[in-house]
Amino acid sequence: MKKNILKILMDSYSKESKIQTVRRVTSVSLLAVYLTMNTSSLVLAKPIENTNDTSIKNVEKLRNAPNEENSKKVEDSKNDKVEHVKNIEEAKVEQVAPEVKSKSTLRSASIANTNSEKYDFEYLNGLSYTELTNLIKNIKWNQINGLFNYSTGSQKFFGDKNRVQAIINALQESGRTYTANDMKGIETFTEVLRAGFYLGYYNDGLSYLNDRNFQDKCIPAMIAIQKNPNFKLGTAVQDEVITSLGKLIGNASANAEVVNNCVPVLKQFRENLNQYAPDYVKGTAVNELIKGIEFDFSGAAYEKDVKTMPWYGKIDPFINELKALGLYGNITSATEWASDVGIYYLSKFGLYSTNRNDIVQSLEKAVDMYKYGKIAFVAMERITWDYDGIGSNGKKVDHDKFLDDAEKHYLPKTYTFDNGTFIIRAGDKVSEEKIKRLYWASREVKSQFHRVVGNDKALEVGNADDVLTMKIFNSPEEYKFNTNINGVSTDNGGLYIEPRGTFYTYERTPQQSIFSLEELFRHEYTHYLQARYLVDGLWGQGPFYEKNRLTWFDEGTAEFFAGSTRTSGVLPRKSILGYLAKDKVDHRYSLKKTLNSGYDDSDWMFYNYGFAVAHYLYEKDMPTFIKMNKAILNTDVKSYDEIIKKLSDDANKNTEYQNHIQELADKYQGAGIPLVSDDYLKDHGYKKASEVYSEISKAASLTNTSVTAEKSQYFNTFTLRGTYTGETSKGEFKDWDEMSKKLDGTLESLAKNSWSGYKTLTAYFTNYRVTSDNKVQYDVVFHGVLTDNADISNNKAPIAKVTGPSTGAVGRNIEFSGKDSKDEDGKIVSYDWDFGDGATSRGKNSVHAYKKAGTYNVTLKVTDDKGATATESFTIEIKNEDTTTPITKEMEPNDDIKEANGPIVEGVTVKGDLNGSDDADTFYFDVKEDGDVTIELPYSGSSNFTWLVYKEGDDQNHIASGIDKNNSKVGTFKSTKGRHYVFIYKHDSASNISYSLNIKGLGNEKLKEKENNDSSDKATVIPNFNTTMQGSLLGDDSRDYYSFEVKEEGEVNIELDKKDEFGVTWTLHPESNINDRITYGQVDGNKVSNKVKLRPGKYYLLVYKYSGSGNYELRVNK
């Protein structure tokens, strides 16, 4: 819960709209399957590396439970146990594939070729053009060694324009002569040409192949293929010809004639939709055809006015056919993907229509026609992204409202518990009884968790999980729409997102999952408890999450505590024991392997073996289990590592562990699954609250008791807290064991009482201590149903809500606000602040400056007009002023040298303002070596200001000043090595100025990438715009990931300068979906650059090489 998510991206969750969260999630929902159907598809139109990077899952904490369709599937595939995803969307959103299932055996029969001889470029270059084309015509493309690799041979082969033209001519001839059963080498011809265009894109020696004018030379061949009477869906050969044409268009080019010639194929497909849509090969053919055209057109139109494109207004027949496909209606599970394709590409190609309004109306019609179905989400998204969110009526469409309404459609019911701190939103087919059971299940898990962990105080308050929200869809099918609604992965049985304090899952039948809803909830609820009460900091962030330290623990103890009971401790579940029993003895994890497991383990059995470790420690080595939890609770990485190493290296412990696994496996047949008792659901009848509290306190020997009552939708509950003082301490671990048994005995004793409400009691103990007279002492907590409603006050307590930063600097004013606090049945009459350093304040809003670095708890107490109070606290970390990280904007106060902001480094722009009474800003910078320094300060507003530069140690004599030149205050001066200050001030208080400060000539070292950064979760952070990053791709290092954040919408220019001769490029991806490529680098000599308009959010920049090795410099400019 964790350090306010470091403002990395989870901050944006509370601020961004739903449409920002789910941006581009559904736009290509059906394409992923087709992009990888054929090996040759891996080279896309303009070659962009496939970035199906699972490491993007490490941006936000999503706690995922196993999704187990059946035991064999889970046993055989890790996809049934989905790893945590830290993205927010962290979350990676998996693409939703159409129902058409891909199988290699469904590839065209023409692919088979008994001639498996291989050919290299040295041989091919020795053939005449006629010999070459005859050979190509009769072999498969993958018989040519290194076809897509740049080499001396491929350079010579494709460097011969006449040879390439001969291949194009041969393709044209095959296009005229192919039959329904003989493609005349069309697939191989197109793949050879695609290889040439691929290599031409990245290599200057073949740059002519990247010229659209040359690529247009393929158009006659394309038209010849289309004019052939066999150009239609039919035999495997005919389908493959259409597929090859689509791929070639994507790598080469097309025009309006080529596009409109595709209409008969689309029409044939639509008119036979029920027959053709389930056919993988025909679906591939149509998809490749449409996709290839769109890829070519979008590349040609990039950053250009679409109205200037030669096909603008000339492809209406094609657009109309896409419209007919998209609005086909009467869809089935087998045909839905096709209409999805139609709507998506209708939007894309509609940009070239002269009737924009008709396109938008069609998209709006799709929203209504496929109400809250996948296609409706795609249509709404395309209006938002392709048409700037403007509807056919000229007004802004409310995408957020659409998503909210969709969520209400799928989750129409809301249930509240514990004064609104436990909320369940559910589908209409999820029974109320099950909802109640889930609430009581949480209490059983909570009681056993706190016993073991020894803490029930939230590590941080004021975060989203102060209110736990659970969203339960009716079925796995409806759950899939959560991708569209909330932008999270749904290829799982359920997941918990810590920064949202929300758990998502679905109701299921035994046929759909071996785990019941309650079992899965118990697992996920444990993740909530881990985050709130045990592991400090955001999941996936910090040293505890390096090197798979806690992966086994997170998942293993979640499986363990899912077996929590009311009075029998924690029991093993049959559903988990089944895996241990089925796994062969020689395949079982060792203790060392289990303790070092992670999501990269292919079989994902560490869930089950992690459970086995937790159960082993719980049953046979509780001292180690408690020490382990203490180390985590105290963020003591060193002690935790020592515990893990000791266990890993102890052969005897491993033997005991293996024996324990066998004991668990032997219990499989007789094991059960701990679920809540029917006793929780009974009508318990009235019993006076004071009697209940008294009887519990007496039975448990408690003193200093206090009680709070909680109101829920179906019943009310109470929480009773007190102090237990026992006999002489026998040591912490013996005391723990005896206390746990005593508490279970108390619960069982109370359950024998005539009032059945005692059967709803759960209890735990925390805060172990020993008194001065050596007596053991615990804080004990009981929770149960409350039938005396008189104990529930009619006055609703106010709700305190604090807003403020999670970090600050010593001496800097920090603003805190309680404006979001509220009182539902009255008004708040006072706000009392405690800043944790001895200072206090009163008022709705407050400003405070800390004098020392440290971590402080800021607490706001609000009091309503009836005297009820509420408090909220959060942690703020105060640091000494950072003198190493470059700044990009001023921070007040900075009126004099003592308060100067900095450092300023070369290449990083610093923005500031002088408004109203703020008449001066001061910054510092360091000069690395003697020489000329230039300061440029472009501005807007009044020119009635200037700047002065002072050398450190002499604040009386300035050494330079700025002069006005073209709306910029500029100056160049000779400087010596050392620290300097620039003092910017205005001449009168009436002037308002906004400025940008740039300094050149400092000799600052450029920032360097931090290896290993070959996956997105290890991305090197680009701290500021306009910063030069030095990187290298040498030897086996083939990729580097970078990340940066955009605070305000605007254009970003990404530039990569090659320092060596090698093949390198980059692609840009949004944090919300790594598979969504926003743009890519355009090669121009040694520079690979592009400009793109970006919205606020986090982005990942992937730099990768495709030939050779070398160094580069990278800048993200704004």
Swiss-Prot record:
Substitution effect: residue 1080 to A: S3b fragment has 12-fold decreased affinity for collagen
Binding site for Ca(2+) 6: 1011, 1013-1014, 1037, 1039-1040
Induction profile: RNA levels are high in late logarithmic phase.
The PKD domain, residue ranges: 797-885
Mechanisms controlling activity: Inhibited by 1-10-phenanthroline. Inhibited by peptidomimetic isoamyl-phosphonyl-Gly-Pro-Ala, which binds to Zn(2+). Inhibited by broad-spectrum zinc metalloprotease inhibitor batimastat. N-aryl mercaptoacetamide-based inhibitors have been isolated that act on clostridial collagenases with submicromolar affinity while having negligibile activity on human collagenases.
Cofactor: Ca(2+); Zn(2+)
Effect of residue 1104 to A/S: S3b fragment has no collagen binding
Cofactor, free-text remark: Binds about 7 Ca(2+) per subunit. The metallopeptidase and PKD domains each bind 1 Ca(2+), while each CDB binds 2. Binds 1 catalytic Zn(2+) per subunit, a Zn-free form has been crystallized.
Entries under InterPro entries matching the protein: ColG_subdomain, Ig-like_fold, Peptidase_C_arc/bac, Peptidase_M9_N_dom, Peptidase_M9A/M9B, PKD/Chitinase_dom, PKD_dom, PKD_dom_sf
Site (C-terminus of form C1b): 1006
Region feature S1 metalloprotease domain, degrades both FALGPA (furylacryloyl-Leu-Gly-Pro-Ala) and type I collagen, mapped onto this chain: 111-786
Residues involved in Ca(2+) 3 binding: 890, 892, 918, 921
Segments of this protein annotated with the region Degrades soluble FALGPA peptide (furylacryloyl-Leu-Gly-Pro-Ala) but not type I collagen: 396-1118
UniProt site positions, description: C-terminus of form C1c: 1018
Uses, biotech or industry: Widely used for tissue dissociation due to their potent activity on connective tissue. A mix of ColG and ColH is used for isolation of pancreatic islet cells for subsequent transplantation.
EC number annotated for this UniProt entry: 3.4.24.3
UniProt modification remark: Upon purification gives 67 kDa, 78 kDa, 82 kDa and 116 kDa (full-length) proteins all of which have the same N-terminus; only the longest form digests insoluble collagen. At least 2 in vivo isolated forms (C1b and C1c) are missing the second collagen-binding domain, ending on Lys-1006 and Lys-1018 respectively.
Variant or mutagenesis effect after changing residue 1062 to A: S3b fragment has 2.4-fold increased affinity for collagen
Start and end residues of each stretch annotated as Catalytic subdomain: 389-670
Signal sequence coordinates: 1-45
Annotated stretches, region: Collagen-binding: 1102-1106
Binding site for Ca(2+) 2: 795-796, 823, 825, 864
Family: Belongs to the peptidase M9B family. Collagenase subfamily.
Protein name (database record): Collagenase ColG
